[in-house]
Amino acid sequence: MKRARLEDDFNPVYPYEHYNPLDIPFITPPFASSNGLQEKPPGVLSLKYTDPLTTKNGALTLKLGTGLNIDENGDLSSDASVEVSAPITKTNKIVGLNYTKPLALRSNALTLSYNAPLNVVNNNLALNISQPVTVNANNELSLLIDAPLNADTGTLRLQSAAPLGLVDKTLKVLFSSPLYLDNNFLTLAIERPLALSSSRAVTLKYSPPLKIENENLTLSTGGPFTVSGGNLNLTTSAPLSVQNNSLSLVITSPLKVINSMLAVGVNPPFTITDSGLAMDLGDGLALGGSKLIINLGPGLQMSNGAITLALDAALPLQYRDNQLQLRIGSTSGLIMSGVTQTLNVNANTGKGLAVENNSLVVKLGNGLRFDSWGSITVSPTTTTPTTLWTTADPSPNATFYESLDAKVWLVLVKCNGMVNGTISIKAQKGILLRPTASFISFVMYFYSDGTWRKNYPVFDNEGILANSATWGYRQGQSANTNVSNAVEFMPSSKRYPNQKGSEVQNMALTYTFLQGDPNMAISFQSIYNHALEGYSLKFTWRVRNNERFDIPCCSFSYVTEQ
């Protein structure tokens, strides 16, 4: 092997002290050994060591973990801060072991306390067992079992069949009535006619007609009962019969069954009383000595079993030749018709008399009538209504902003060719209690015959009579709403032409006082026939802002159509 060339400043004395250790030639000292020594780096003899040995400042030392240090004497010591976990303990810097029974410390050795069936065999803990407990081939503790025990599911179970069963994890006998438990003994509950004999057997108590025959309970029978085919039968004869397995009675009219009772069917005049069958007797019939007889009144008699007349006729009647006759005088006003043989009145129908519906009546001329007592009286003069109104004291009857929010009194009084009217308004609710509009109007519309026109469209701030309001001819303090023609109350269509409500000839203007307060004067305008057709009335008042719209009685007048 060719050695590297040595530098001039190389010191051949170990450890060579060359300034560049990497260039140290491979010179192995004669005392180098791999046992604790090594040549690292090459040409340098160093100490081979592992943890916890290390070097510090060129000196060999120990790596110290938690709880270890080197004291001032250079000795390795512990600061007793060793961390332990259960069951190891540390008390006063002494490490110990925490244990409980069955562990114990004997002769400074940890031992195990035990009782039978545990035992120590060859320094091993063992279990003393005997059959049926055994150890199987897998060194597992097992149990030798036989039917009815079973351990197929890993649990020791008792196999059972009815009437045995488990109830609340307890083996019990399952039973129901008539069985019950009496002092933990299974007992049979019995009631008469069952009983217990002296041998504690269940027996049957019976009395006639029951009997025991061939160890079977049977029935002693006598007529009309018989036993046939194991069934009890009833022998019957007419009028008794068996129908639908029921005993019945064969009956014919007039017998019938009412409310499950046998009864006699009767038709008038027969009836049923508490005492028996009876007959209702009408007029002319009576009972005499338990016989039905004819009750004869005056003028009748029985002759040879037949009813005959026994009359003493008084005038104008007479009884002659077995006939009752009427005598008629020549001046009586009565005549006998020879054809119909009827008595007629000989009336002079040309002088105030007539025959109507077979009655003699008086013929009445113009201006005469019959009063409620049937007397002839003079007919009263026909009275023409002169007033149309909403009654003297109406309920809320007008709608302005909401249904029935005002009460309106409107009166039209006919005076020859004029109508004098009045209108007043009482606010009831809503906006009318605090109005803010500039003007508020009330309108009435009429057909061409003068009758009230309902459901006519209105504009803002206008009120009309509600459909439920009362409007008609005055009748006392109320009104007759049967108004079929009231043209005579309507404004003249010539004087107040239609569709000219904005012109002066169709209007009237005056003043009134809101709420009747002289300090709140407001204008009042009446307009006639402002609508497109028919007749109309429109009344308009100026509004005081937020002041209740109560209008006192306002008067108006106009020329009528007729």
UniProtKB/Swiss-Prot annotation:
Keyword Zinc-finger: no
Domain of life: Viruses
Protein name in the entry: Fiber protein 1
Function: Forms spikes that protrude from each vertex of the icosahedral capsid. Interacts with host receptor CXCAR to provide virion initial attachment to target cell. Fiber proteins are shed during virus entry, when virus is still at the cell surface.
InterPro entries listed in its UniProt record: Adeno_fibre, Adeno_fibre_knob, Adenobir_fibre_prot_rpt/shaft, Adenovirus_pIV-like_att, Attachment_protein_shaft_sf
Example of a GO cellular component annotation carried by this entry: host cell nucleus
Quaternary state and interactors: Homotrimer. Interacts with host receptor CXCAR. Interacts (via N-terminal tail region) with pentons.
Family designation: Belongs to the adenoviridae fiber family.
Additional information: All late proteins expressed from the major late promoter are produced by alternative splicing and alternative polyadenylation of the same gene giving rise to non-overlapping ORFs. A leader sequence is present in the N-terminus of all these mRNAs and is recognized by the viral shutoff protein to provide expression although conventional translation via ribosome scanning from the cap has been shut off in the host cell.
Subcellular location: Virion; Host nucleus
Domain notes: The tail region anchors the fiber to penton base capsomers, whereas the shaft, built from several repeated motifs, allows the knob to protrude from the virion.
Keyword Plastid attached: no
Keywords recorded for this protein, A-Z: Capsid protein, Host nucleus, Host-virus interaction, Late protein, Viral attachment to host adhesion receptor, Viral attachment to host cell, Virion, Virus entry into host cell
GO biological-process terms attached to the record: adhesion receptor-mediated virion attachment to host cell; cell adhesion; symbiont entry into host cell
Induction text: Expressed in the late phase of the viral replicative cycle.
